[in-house]
Amino acid sequence: MNGNSKVHTEENKNEHQQEGKGGEQEQEQINKHINKDTINNNNNNNNSMSMEMDINSVSVNSLSEPTPNEQQNNNNNNNSNGNGNGNDETTSSKTTTIINSNPLDTDTIMHLNNNDSSNNTTTTTIPRQSSSSIQNGIHKEENINQLTEIQLQPSLQIMDKEQQMNGIEESTTIATQTTLPTNNNNNNNNNNNNNNNNNNNNNNILEKESNGVQEIEDSPNHLSLKRKLMILEEMGLISDDNNKNNNNNSIDIPNSNRLNQIPSSYKTSLYICLYPIGYAIDNIYKDKIFTYNDKISKDFLNSISQGKLTPYIINILDQLSEQNDQKQQQQQQQQQQQQQQQQQQQQQQQQQQQTNNIYQNSNEITYYNGCIVVNIKDYRGFAENEQIAKTFNSKNMKPYPITVPIGTFKEFIEKRIILKPTMESLLFDIKKNCSTLNNDNKNNNINNINNINNNNNNNNNNNNNNNNNININNNNNINNYLNIKESEIVNEEYLLNFEKCLLHAITPQLELSVNPNCFFDQLETKQKQLYNQSHSLFSYKRFKPSDFIGLKYPVVYNNNNNNNNNNNKSYNNISNNNNNNVSNRFIKTHSISNIQERQQVNNNDLSTISTQQSPPTLIQTSAKRSIITLNTQINTTNSCLPNDNFSLFKFLNSNPKWVNERKSMLQYHSNINQTQSFPFNYQFNNNNNNNNNIPVNNNNNNVITQPPFGNGINTFSIKPSIMTKIPIECEQLNGRLLQFFSTSNLTVLTFECKAKPTGYELLMYVSETTQVLNTLISLRNLKFTAPSTSTSSSSSSGGTTTTTTATGTTPTTPTPVPLTQQQLIQQLISFSLNKPILPLNQQSPLAEASYVLDTQLPQPTYLSFPIGNSKQAHFLINHMKSCIEHEGHYILSYDSSFPDTISSQAQEIRKKAEYIHNQQQLNQQQQLQYHLQQQKQQQQQQQQQQQQQNQQQQQQNQQQQQNQQNQQQNQQQNQQQNQQQQQQQNQQNQQNQQNQQQNQQQQQQQNQQQQQNQQTQQQQTQQQIQQNQQQPTQQIQQQNQQQIQQNQQQLQQQQLQQQQQQIQQQQIQLQQQQIQQKQLQQLQQQQQQQQQQQQQQQQQQQQQQQQQQQQQQQQQQQQQQQQQQQQLQQTRNLQPQQIQTQPLQQPPNQMAQSMISPQSTPSTSPSPQQQYQTTPVLQAGVQPQSQLTIKQPIQQPLQPLQQPQPQPQQQQQQQQQQPPQPQPQPQQFAQHLQQQQMQRPQAQLQPPQILQQLQQQQQQQQQQLQPPQILQQQYQTLQPQQLILQQQIHEKQNIHQQMLLQQQRNQTNLQLLQQQAQQIPPNNPQLLQTNQQQQQFVTQQIQHQHQQLLQSQSIIQQLQLQLHQQQQLQQLQAQLQQQTSPNIIQQQQQQQQQQQQQQRIN
């Protein structure tokens, strides 16, 4: 303790606790009032004032509560007032207190002395914090008349692993306290109450030390384990299930590893359907089709086929996310309205909800490490209806979107593709993110101003209630706002917002994770199993981390030792309470495993700190953190790893080693005299003291002293001294430039500090090259060389003047400007960031984004940060510099304040990057030259081709003229020929008509002749009947025989004429049926033989019947002779009457039917009247000899009729036309003959002759029995032949159908090849050649198949002819069997009767 008087500051806290429903967290809002305590001292020591704040260890929603003793002191202090002097640089009325919740670290007390020109000093007693917390204090520059309170938002803290295991929990609170100035009349009261306040504070400190560790659990500033778990849940790093299993105060946080999941579980973000006429995007434009011919659609599909996530697709996905948000809001409103409706509409609501859920699931967007899954369905060639297919395949469709009928396409080919981001998409993403952040910052600034005004009013009201002597006017409120704006402290809230914006801007949001090969390997294997490569619509490419960016220096990662998971990055929200409207792909959180592992290494390394003869370099300090190897051939397994990734919570974590490294880096990169290179709280003097040891570890109270740093200057063991004045270098921040290189994606960050009337502003430019810095330097030089066109404005904070040049705004007065400067200014002004995103129907945003490598101006992608006054700007710039350097992926390449102190590593990387850039430029120049040469050659070739084409066109024109003349001549000739042909055809038609008329006349004549013949026959028969009645019986028989012969001859002649006509008509058919004629001839001969046999059989039957009748007659005659002898006299007169009456008992039709054979044709059969007229011939007495003579001539004229027989088809037709005729009755005729024989004398019988005849008849019957057996054998052989032919025909028909299907497939393939040939650009002759070759091959296959089809048709026709012939033969045989079967039965019966007769005769 020094001899200076002590001043103890006190706190006054008003607690407001609100308990929410459902177990919500308690919210504490505390208004802090700090009174001013000053003591006038006579010491003239020149000391500097410094205030330190703890950023790395901050509690969440917990502030220090006052003890009862402190509350009494606060009540006493409410009536006191502080000294307030009106001088600017002599007095200061601000004090800050940092209250520590851990009583173990209260041994050391730091002294901050402030020596004003009026010898008035204010000191504050601040308990030392642990080594885990590093204090970053901020000095206020001016005397403040009135200050208000600033409410702090809660920050987050992640504990060390050792602290979590041992159960030791620490937290500190930062309280930026302000005081209100009062009148100078109350200064004495403050001086009187200082000693009492100091004593109370000392008593409180001693009480805490005596309680020890037990005070930790009961202290209100303590951050409990439950609260830590709640914070981790809000961050998304731990689930609710882990809260239940919290034994031994340990936290098990699972690492999110999405890449180890099954590829099928990944959700698709875009659904694309390919139709014959165009494509559709089902997520956004449902049932609408876009054409393939548009440039936008070509770029869109090409990017998908190449697997690239372009900025155009990002815009589409953003539109989709916006639509999803709107749909959710609409659905919520609809649900509220639907609940009020009746119960009858519940069914409709369920259906609507089902459909809405389907659309919601399909519209969700999910990013997997910056990648998207796209689902493609190809419906081309799978239309259900032919009409719909024709409409879609037609080329006369309208260009605007059309609606697709539902259910038209059912079959499709499906494929899933992954899109990865490119360099253009990364830059576009940063640009879009920066634009959203700028809009958010503007809104936040407005809200902060309103909050400050409200806080000022509340504080003023509280002070009026406590202090009756204070009266504040409205003018004082305005002065308060201005003073706060000028001297605003860089508090915790502002620092967090600054780091968030910096994190979003620096990190590439769409960069892939640690080991993406697992994801793509799994997906590739699944796609090979599920889908054939032949059906692939787009060329699938295997993605690698270095492919999509084209890096010369790929990022190499390593697996963690403690955790087996390969991936530690997860794209989740940092917290659900963020108001920034940023999508999931913009936010990237990190797992805690890296932080815990880093803390173990740091705690082990702190104990082995040794003396350093020279400052540590970047390579030495970052060797154990994250070195990104630049060698492209290093394997992923043996590479150095980033054990600590850049995170927002890194700055809040208690890690003293990182702070020490930052100090050493800052000291190494700056000279000792240039103190402005350090942050404000790290500026020290050369005063050496002995009691300046800082504890490093919280668990052990061992104090590690660090040796001095070069030239006897200590950095860690030096007591900080108070600074009376800020150096000029700190205030001259306008135009400061910083540049950083990226090692992961070769982006360049350039920062520029500009002065404005309200304060300083930091601009960040994102580009691909280093030329942005050169343009800014050239603009800065032009600003100084140009005439004075700027307006000067003095900053109210520190009295320094800042100038605003014409680079950002237009000049107020017209001044002559050189051409170079004017061009640069116009080009700078022309850039506009807030441009609208174009929809689908307009051009893509890539056309507007000017990502040109050779531009000499800053890119339009920038981000602005309001920094504040000179002190705040100086602090934040150095803070930003250290953050980016420690992040690992960016290295400092240029600093305008220290251009010569750049690290060796940065110089090497810069040289390599410049070398690569120069090589790229050379390659581009060579490519340009090569392209120019090719273009010249192409132009020359095109000119030659055009000349050749012109010549060919002239020749073609001449040929066309000749062809036209030839065509005209040919047309005339064709017309003449057609006329002649028509005339000939007319003549032929006339002749045909005449011939037809003649034929009809001939047929009529023939019919008339037939009628006349019939009439003549009837007349002749009538005449013959009359003559027969008069002539004797013998003459009548002869005449009858002659007439029968004549009739038969006439009938034969008529049949021959008809057959000749039929033969003439069938000559054309006989040529095709030569194979059948032989078989038909054989069958005809068989039929003739069968007919002859049948006639012989009939004759034998008649003879047998006659013999039987004769025997019966002999018996009767014997009986009659005996009777006659007895009655001769009585019966003499009656005998002639009996002889006449007995033959009349027979029917008259029997004799006529017996005279004609049963096989006679229907045309020759007489009518029943004619038959009845012929019966009187047999009424007279007939002798027995005439029976034999009658049957012999009947058989002779029937034989020539059997030779010319009509074909079976004609016979069937004639049989259908003929009416049914009565069959002959041979039995009745036989009975009639028997009665006649009974009347004859017995002397006329000759038994030997009868026996001979019977033997002949038996031989004939045996011969007639053979043909039916032969017919049965032939009938049985024909059936298996027909079955064999039918099987052969069936097999040939199946083969024929398969060949037709193959021909149709080849035709469809040819159509597809023709469509592809139309889509192929003319720049690819190789593809055209391959396509033409494929078309030729397909056409050859089609021709070959056509020939095979013709051959198979001919074979099938031949087989069908054979089968038809066999069927006809089978029908003929069936008919013959039907005719022969009844004859055979009769023959068998007759044979039995004959055998009986022979037995009787013998």
Curated annotation (Swiss-Prot):
Pfam families: Spt20_SEP. Residues 1-29, 60-107, 114-133, 177-206, 786-817, 1136-1174, 1199-1250 are annotated as: Disordered. InterPro entries: Spt20-like_SEP. It comes from the Eukaryota. Residues 60-72 have a biased composition (Polar residues). Residues 7-29 have a biased composition (Basic and acidic residues). Residues 73-102, 183-204, 786-812, 1136-1150, 1157-1174, 1199-1218, 1226-1250 have a biased composition (Low complexity). PANTHER family: GATA ZINC FINGER DOMAIN-CONTAINING PROTEIN 4-RELATED (PTHR36911:SF3), LIM ZINC-BINDING DOMAIN-CONTAINING PROTEIN-RELATED (PTHR36911). Belongs to the SPT20 family. This is Transcription factor SPT20 homolog. It comes from Dictyostelium discoideum (Social amoeba). The lineage of its organism: Eukaryota, Amoebozoa, Evosea, Eumycetozoa, Dictyostelia.
